[in-house]
Amino acid sequence: RTALAQTAGAADGLAATMRAAAMDVIERRYTDVEFDAVQLAAELHVSRRQLNRYFSGAPRTVQQAILTRRLAAVRGMILTVPHRDLESIARECGFADGGAMRSRFLRSFGIGPAAFRRAAAAAVPVPDAMLLTAEQTARGRPSPAATIAE
């Protein structure tokens, strides 16, 4: 291999390692309303710009990764704690308030959290976009589809 190819391979490996480290921090800190890409970069001891570079080959940006984790937590809580009010779910999942959570949920899934809750309670089929990914299920999180079917 050429020196350039070896350097590119090492850079790809570093980016993958840093993305994995970032995802670990996101998993630990997503419930903190103040947590964002700036704090994530600081915790990883890199600049925000460098963190964005590490995510440039990933399917999501840094901020999208944080939002995706928060929304997955919202879905899970709606399904597992159906009587908890949406405001408290929003705060527990890292959103500043229920309005912010509702708008992000609706924009991401095409259905609001209250409608999602009603669909789950009525055992109405839920669009695939709202189901956990295989990666999330492999980490031991139950599939919302299984919860709805019960």
What do these predicted ranges mean?
Residues 18-62, 82-93:
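DNA-binding recognition helix and immediately preceding turn/loop
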Residues 81-119:
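Sequence-specific DNA-binding recognition helix
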Residues 56-65, 109-113, 125:
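Short, solvent-exposed alpha-helical "recognition" segments
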Residues 22-26, 70-78, 105, 109, ...:
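Short hydrophobic clusters on alpha-helical segments that form packing/core surfaces
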Residues 111, 127, 144-150:
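Extended, charge-rich intrinsically disordered regulatory tails
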Residues 66-76, 115-136:
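Short, basic, alpha-helical segments at the C-terminal edge of helix-turn-helix-like DNA-binding modules
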Residues 9-20, 61-70:
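Short, Lys/Arg-enriched anionic-surface-contact patches
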Residues 1-8:
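An amphipathic alpha-helical interaction segment
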